[in-house]
Amino acid sequence: MPDMKPVQDIHAHHLGKWAENQALNILQANGFKLVIRNFHSRVGEIDLIVAKADELIFVEVKARTLGSYAAANEVLLVSQQRKIIKTAQYFLNRYPDYQQFYCRFDVICFDFPHKIAKTVQQDFSKLRYDQQWIENAFTL
């Protein structure tokens, strides 16, 4: 029997990918270039790493719908921040050319104020949502 994922997991995956694409579009519209997407270390993952001039931004992307226990900008726990910081340090050690860049941690959030049908493949951009870009959301 094939490994079947629950509908809500598939839905969350599609919403997450949509949010990452939207966040990247916003960043690129502001002059940032993608360095790497979904960078992994053994402790965590960073959704987007972008650069402009001598500035390097590690971006966490969050998307939430009505029924989630908190708004997107409220769900980044201190433990998650530590994992992102450690992963950023790993990135800088692996790619030393970026060590002289000014680095910061941003969060881009998407909140949908209503439930989204989980059984339908959605074009999330057609739905109403609030978007927030939190620069310097946390520091080392």
Swiss-Prot record:
Single Gene Ontology MF annotation: nucleic acid binding
Superkingdom of source: Bacteria
Entry-linked SUPFAM superfamilies: Restriction endonuclease-like
Pfam assignment, any one: UPF0102
Disulfide bonds: none
Matching HAMAP family: UPF0102 (MF_00048)
PANTHER family per record: UPF0102 PROTEIN YRAN (PTHR34039:SF1)
Family according to the record: Belongs to the UPF0102 family.
Protein name, entry field: UPF0102 protein ACIAD1132
